[in-house]
Amino acid sequence: MERRDFLKTAAAASVAATTPNALAQSPAATPTTRPQNPDMIYRQLGTTGEIVSAIGLGGFHIGKQADPADSIKIIHTAIDHGITFMDNCWDYNDGISEVRMGHALDNGYRQKVFLMTKLDGRTVTEYNKQLEQSLGRLHTDVIDLVQFHEVIRMEDPDRIFADDGAIHAAMAAKKAGKIRYIGFTGHKDPAVHLRMLEVAKAHGFHFDTVQMPVNVMDAHFRSFTHQVMPVAIEQGIGVLAMKTFGDHFILDSKTVEPLEALHYGLTQPVSVVITGIDSLPILGQALQAARTFKPLTDAQVKSILDRTQQAALTGKFELFKTTPHFDGTAANPKWLG
C-alpha cells in the first residue's frame, strides 16, 4: 500500500440513526493533552482527536523481567523520552504486565500517557469482570482505550455483537466513564478483521481503533496492510501496527535489520507502531528509530519487499498467522466467557 497523508484524508465514520439494530453510542470522548518530546514522532489516533506517540510500548515484554524494578525503569525511561502510547492486555503474563505498568504509572506518570489494554471476554459478564481487574491492576479509574483481544475466529464478531455480547458492556463502561475509546485486535487472517468491521457496521457501531500485523513480510501472505488497512483508513479508524518483528522470528530470517523494520512500519499510514521492549538497549533502538525516521521511498519499500518475499512465503516467520503459537485464547477458551 502506498503511503498517504492519512491525517488529511481519513474520513470520519458516522453512525446513521436509521441503521437496523443500531447501537446507541455514547458521546465522543474529549481528547486530552500530554507532554511531547522533540525527539519523538506524534500522530493523530484515527479521528479521535487524540495525539499519541508513533512508537508504542508493548505490554507483553515488560512483564518478563526477573526484577519488577527493571520493568518499571523501562516504562519510566520510555515515558521520559516521549513515548506516550502504552499497550497492555488483561492476560499478559497472567496479569503481571498490567500490575507492573500500574505501579510504573503512579506518582504522576499516568497523566503523561495514553493507556490502552485489551480484554478477552466475549460476554457482558466476562468483559465486566476482566475490566474491573484491569482497572485495579493499572491503578486507574479510567482506561483511555480498551480493545477486544484476539479477534481471530470468524465467529468472534458475532459473539461480541450478540444480545449478551461484550460490545454492550464496553459501551456501558464508556458511558460510565471507565473507558474512553473502543477498538479490537487480531493477528490471524484479514478476513476476520473485515468481518468484524462488517458486523460493526451492520449494528451501526464505529470502532475507534484496530490493531493488526504490519511488517515487512505481511504484504506477501494474508496481508492486513493490503486488505484491512485501506478500509480502516477510509472509515477513520486509527490503525495500530503490531508484530513489526513477528516477536523475533522476522529478524531471524536475516532479511531485514531492526531499524529498517521499524522504519517500514512507521512509513505506513498507521497511528502507532507498537513494539515489544524488554530492555533498555531495545528501548534505545526504538527511540533511535523515531529520531532517525524519514519515510521510505517507493524504491526502498520495493527493495525490502523483494528481499523478504521468498522467506515470507515459507510461512516460518509470521507464525501468528500460520500456527497457534500466539493464540492465548485458543489455549484458554475460558477467558472468552
Question: Model-predicted segments: where are they?
Answer:
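N-terminal binding-site loop/beta-alpha segment at the start of enzyme catalytic domains
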Residues: 1-112, 169, 175
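Structured C-terminal cap/extension of enzyme domains
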Residues: 13, 203, 227-337
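A general structural detector for well-ordered alpha-helical segments in enzyme core domains, enriched
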Residues: 41, 71-75, 97-104, 130-134, ...
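Conserved, mostly hydrophobic/aromatic
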Residues: 45, 57, 86, 101, ...
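Active-site mouth loops of central-metabolism enzymes
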Residues: 58-68, 118-125, 158-159, 252
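Short catalytic-loop micro-motif centered on adjacent basic/acidic residues
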Residues: 84-91, 116-118, 180-185, 211-212, ...
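Structural motif corresponding to the early beta-alpha repeats
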Residues: 92, 107-128, 149-152
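Glycine/proline-rich, positively charged
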Residues: 122-227, 233-240
